[in-house]
Amino acid sequence: MAEMSNNKTSEEAKANGKKSQSETLEESKLENMNSEESTETTQTESMETAETETSLQTELESAKKEIESLKDSWARERAEFQNFKRRSAQEFVSIRKEAVKSLVSGFLNPIDNLERVGATQTNSEELKPFVDGVTMILKEFYSVLEKSNVIRFDPKGEPFDPMSMEALSSEEGDQYSEETVIDVYQPGYYYKENEDKFTLRPARVRIGKPKS
């Protein structure tokens, strides 16, 4: 009986040993499978991360190019707008010049005639009030023109300026160190507003020049 019991115990021990070995093998297989799955998962995640980074990098480069394109486009638009403003300003100045010249030129000849009358020397008691009246009218004309930024100028004694004067005659002499206006046949007019100034009618003058 004791021997049978020992044999049974021995068989159970062997069976348990085999079972333990089998379980160990199963556990090892499971661990290997889990390890492989974990490795595959890690590799997959790494690949997905790399793909995501590549995609983001591509999008970033595309966004940079688009920003540069927009900056270039904005710079061109701004330059075109500045050119448009400059052209518009130049055109406006040109139109205004022509408008002022056209308006003022219609008054200049009558004013010249009145000036000749006003400069008349007379001892006649009958004509004197008339001449004085013309002089007063001229002063009113000058005042109206000045309020409109139109200035009359008589450059006698000043250096000759070909931009605002027209020399109709000249003489040479040792007394002249430079070209100088010695007589004015007809006064000139210019328009001046802030820094904007241009000649409406050049003064017609006689000049003195150094001997050549």
Swiss-Prot record:
Coiled-coil segments: none
Region annotated Disordered, chain positions: 1-69
UniProt entry tagged with the keyword Chaperone: yes
InterPro entries named in the record: GrpE (IPR000740), GrpE_coiled_coil (IPR013805), GrpE_head (IPR009012)
GO CC terms, sorted: cytoplasm
GO molecular function: adenyl-nucleotide exchange factor activity; protein homodimerization activity; protein-folding chaperone binding; unfolded protein binding
Matching Pfam families: GrpE
Gene Ontology biological process terms in this record: protein folding
Keywords: Chaperone, Cytoplasm, Stress response
Low complexity: compositionally biased ranges: 40-60
Stretches that traverse the bilayer: none
Compartments, as annotated in UniProt: Cytoplasm
Quaternary structure (record): Homodimer.
Alphabetical list of NCBIfam families matching this protein: PRK14146.1
Family to which this protein belongs: Belongs to the GrpE family.
Function: Participates actively in the response to hyperosmotic and heat shock by preventing the aggregation of stress-denatured proteins, in association with DnaK and GrpE. It is the nucleotide exchange factor for DnaK and may function as a thermosensor. Unfolded proteins bind initially to DnaJ; upon interaction with the DnaJ-bound protein, DnaK hydrolyzes its bound ATP, resulting in the formation of a stable complex. GrpE releases ADP from DnaK; ATP binding to DnaK triggers the release of the substrate protein, thus completing the reaction cycle.
Name the UniProt record assigns to this protein: Protein GrpE
Organism: Leptospira interrogans serogroup Icterohaemorrhagiae serovar Lai (strain 56601)
Organism lineage string: Bacteria, Pseudomonadati, Spirochaetota, Spirochaetia, Leptospirales
